[in-house]
Amino acid sequence: MTSKVIYKGSLRTEATHLRSGNTIITDAPTDNKGKGEAFSPTDLVATALASCMLTIMGIKANEMNINIEGASAEVKKIMAAGPRRIAQVIIVI
């Protein structure tokens, strides 16, 4: 098992990475009945994709002895309705 997620009520969850103990809080966004005080679950999906891209770039850069420290990604997530879902993720590296 990698993580454990607990529903805390009020449309909030707490996810714990079991090996390190690090935690992530999620909130439903304000446009979906939430508080919007933390990443939404769909924000994390889009953000995780960008994190994965930078990690893979880092692996290849290390193999090539190239320093990409400070590389960044800007993430834009576009939602669709009926049913509510991620319609598009735009990542600019």
Where are these regions (language model features)?
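Extended beta-strand/beta-hairpin segments
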Residues: M1-T47, T55-I93
